[in-house]
Amino acid sequence: MLIDKFERKIDYIRVSVTSRCNFRCLYCMPNTPFEWEPHENILRYEEMFEFLRLAIDEGINKIRLTGGEPLLRKDLDVFVKMLHDYRPDLDLALTTNGYYLKEYAKKLKDAGLKRVNMSLDSLKPEVAAKIAQKDVLNRVIQGLDEALKVGLKVKLNTVVMQGINDTEILDLLEFAKNKGVTIRFIEFMENERAYPGVKRVDSKVILDKIAKKYKFKELPKDNSASRYFETEDGYVFGIIEPHNEDFCKSCNRIRLTAEGYLIPCLFFTESYNIKEALREGNIQKASEILREVVANKPEKNDWQDEEVSTRAFWETGG
C-alpha cells in the first residue's frame, strides 16, 4: 500500500501515453511555436506496463490514460487489454477530446476500458472551433453517442472561460442531463502555456447561474477532485475548483508522463525519471522511485506562490 506523509492513500495514477494533440485549446496549448517530443523519447507500452504492473501490486487500483490526446497513439486498445488482463477488476478510464472516439469506443470497451471523460466546452460549432482551433463539435458529439451506445460510462468536462463559453453553462448542463451523463464545470487553471487573455470563471458564479433554474444540494465529498451537487429531480453535476483551499486535501493520485517522468503533483516542477530504470529492466530501482515520489508528494499546491509549475498540462496529463 502506498501512503504519503500526510496519511493519504495513493491508489490512482494518471498515465499520459502521448503529449501530442490534434486540438490547440486556448486553455491548454501554447500560443507560440513548439516541437513534439520525438517518438523514441517516449515510453513503449511494454515499459509502461512493467511499471504499472509494479504500481498495481503496490496498491494502485485506478488508472486513467490521458495525453495530449491518447487516441492519437496507435494500438491503445492493445495496451488497455494488457492492463485489463493483468487485473480485471482494475478501474480503467480514459480522458479524451472525443474527436476519434466514434472509431475507437467499441475496441476500447471490448479491451476492458470502463469509463471515459470527454471534453465538451461549447455546444456552438463556432465557439467550439474557436476554443479548439479547428472544427470539432460534430465529431465530438458523435464520439459521445458511440461511447454511450457501446456501454461506456461517460462524464463531460467543460472548462469555463469568461467571454467565451460562460453563457452556455445551463445549455451544457441541459445537454448532459438529456444524455444521461454527468457534467463537470472546471475553473480555468492559469498556466504560462495558455493563450493570453483567457480568464477563469469562479465556481460561485457557475453555481449562481445554475441556481437561476435549478434547486440543488451539495453531496458528501469523496476523494475525487470534484464537488458534486444533486438537483431536486435527481441529476448530478460537478465542479472542479483548483483555487479552493480544500482541493488537495484528499488527493490520491500521482502522474506518469509519456516521456517517463513520475510527477507527485500537477502544480509542482519536481519530477522523477523512471525511463532509465525501465529500459535497464531494473524493477527494483523503479519501485524505489515510485516510493520516493509518494514520500515527496506535497500537502497542497502552491497556487498562489511562484513555485507553481510552468509545465504544460498537455505534457503532464492534465
Swiss-Prot record:
InterPro entries with a match to the protein in the record: Aldolase_TIM, Elp3/MiaA/NifB-like_rSAM, MoaA, MoaA_NifB_PqqE_Fe-S-bd_CS, MoaA_twitch, MoCo_biosynth_MoaA/MoaC, rSAM
Enzyme class, UniProt record, top EC level: lyase
Cofactors: [4Fe-4S] cluster
Sorted UniProt keywords: 4Fe-4S, GTP-binding, Iron, Iron-sulfur, Lyase, Metal-binding, Molybdenum cofactor biosynthesis, Nucleotide-binding, S-adenosyl-L-methionine
GO terms (BP aspect): Mo-molybdopterin cofactor biosynthetic process
Cofactor note: Binds 2 [4Fe-4S] clusters. Binds 1 [4Fe-4S] cluster coordinated with 3 cysteines and an exchangeable S-adenosyl-L-methionine and 1 [4Fe-4S] cluster coordinated with 3 cysteines and the GTP-derived substrate.
Entry-linked Gene3D superfamilies: Aldolase class I
Residue span, Radical SAM core domain: 5-217
Catalytic reaction annotation: GTP + AH2 + S-adenosyl-L-methionine = (8S)-3',8-cyclo-7,8-dihydroguanosine 5'-triphosphate + 5'-deoxyadenosine + L-methionine + A + H(+)
Subunit structure: Monomer and homodimer.
Sequence similarity: Belongs to the radical SAM superfamily. MoaA family.
Functional summary from the UniProt entry: Catalyzes the cyclization of GTP to (8S)-3',8-cyclo-7,8-dihydroguanosine 5'-triphosphate.
UniProt protein name: GTP 3',8-cyclase
Organism field: Nautilia profundicola (strain ATCC BAA-1463 / DSM 18972 / AmH)
